[in-house]
């Protein structure tokens, strides 16, 4: 597939995926303009920790078009909340976590604190600052007369609305903006009856707020297990953890229970699959992930099966290799992949994207791209929320496949932007990552 000549590129988001995409594109030396739009006041995306919380999250939360409202404070610029909590440490060891063109500083912890990653991102962003429009919110992205019209506005009060024209747009806004809380019978009334009794992990900041409270954590992924670890020293025992199919851990501090079937807002009882009932629960914390969101009206209104990007938020539709919009590959995404090591995966995607948009690599035909999508959907057997899931060893295969494609780009540049490759060492660390983490933190690895 041949693409039109691309000279001006917009990147939406200056977080981890947006920054590495900008570096990859600039390294091609093939474009007249590369502009990043970032609504926060500094680059780094969600790694910009905010202690202030938003109080506008609906319960349940199932709308992928939900827009994140800034927190209005005394500062000159509004603050967009981050899902990070105060004591967060990464769930990925530094041997895998970083970009392959920037090492962590010596003596960095194997599983660094959030502020270490924020500083890592700050250093990585430094040479890109002239290309970033900070404190700038993108309102819409629309294809008109063969070009992409990006409508944007400064986040400072009184800023005018502006428009600019681009040949291509890479959406790098991540997938940690719209929390998902499933709609379970009685949940709405239960949450309204006692405000603050139901929250999402994105609103968790510090365990001291849960001292002596009876807590039910919903979910079994890394965020849920991490919150259980932080709550264990302070919360009332046992902490309950609701898992699909239940769980094996039953001890004084933690009891794993089946999924929730109903909330009773009058008695404050929580009914579980199999008949068990929990009572006197002070807080329910949903660690149920996030919805994919494309919060731009002109793109969100695309509804036909051949053109739509979003419907229920389970995944982004019509994207080849989790990157290129099949109907028009001058629109792309970096950072959609789930259950991966984010930085190297985004770097692999960015390296591939840059070589395609510069014309040094060609995409397969539209028919082949659609065939790839159809085969992936068929393999999921209806589990659409796993569309972007690349858990090990899929992520290693994906990263190396993109690396191999990048090696085929012609002509070869004197200084090629690096595409990561995972050899035996990286694969071994990735395969054993959870046991490595459990040993580091002194906890029982998840079953």
UniProtKB/Swiss-Prot annotation:
Q: Which cysteines share a disulfide bond?
A: none
Q: Does this entry carry the keyword Membrane?
A: no
Question: Which key words tag this protein in UniProt?
Answer: FAD, Flavoprotein, Monooxygenase, NADP, Oxidoreductase
* A GO cellular-component term linked to this record: endoplasmic reticulum membrane
Q: Where does FAD bind?
A: 13-17, 38, 46-47, 91-92, 137-138
Give the first-level EC class, as a single word. Answer: oxidoreductase
Q: Known EC number(s)? A: 1.14.13.-
Which Pfam families does this chain map to? FMO-like (PF00743), NAD_binding_8 (PF13450)
Q: Which cofactor does it need?
A: FAD
Q: Name one GO biological process term.
A: cellular detoxification
- Which GO terms label this protein's molecular function in UniProt? FAD binding; N,N-dimethylaniline monooxygenase activity; NADP binding
Q: Where does NADP(+) bind?
A: 90-91, 223-226
Oligomeric form and interacting partners: Monomer.
Q: What job does this protein perform?
A: Flavin-dependent oxidation of thiol-containing compounds. Probably required for the correct folding of disulfide-bonded proteins.
Family under the similarity heading? Belongs to the FMO family.
The protein's name is Thiol-specific monooxygenase
